[in-house]
Design a protein with these regions (language model features):
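RNA-contacting regions in translation and RNA-metabolism proteins
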Residues: 1-43, 55-87
């Protein structure tokens, strides 16, 4: 699915350290989970004021996933954060 590349493109456009952007896609039968990891300095840029940027990214990927009768979940994580700990 193109969701991974879509989120990578959006995130790299927003951050100061695009080389630290990493997206992991976990596909299920009806749901796709996208784990977006960015540098600690860029976390605020990706989340946005009051979470508006994160909400907008979630809206875009859900619209794209709906075309394929799926649901998408975006988790935003700190790049150096241990695996499994969501912010």
């Amino acid at each position: 699915m193109a969701l991974k590349s879509l989120i990578e493109y959006i995130a790299r456009s927003l951050v100061d350290h695009p080389d630290h952007v990493d997206v992991k896609e976990i596909e299920g039968e009806k749901t796709t989970i996208l784990e977006l990891r960015v540098a600690e300095d860029d976390l605020g840029k990706v989340i946005g004021r009051h979470g508006r940027t994160a909400k907008a990214m979630r809206t875009v990927i859900n619209a794209a996933a709906t075309k394929e009768n799926k649901r998408a979940v975006l988790e935003i994580l700190e790049a150096d954060h241990p695996e499994g700990q969501q912010l």
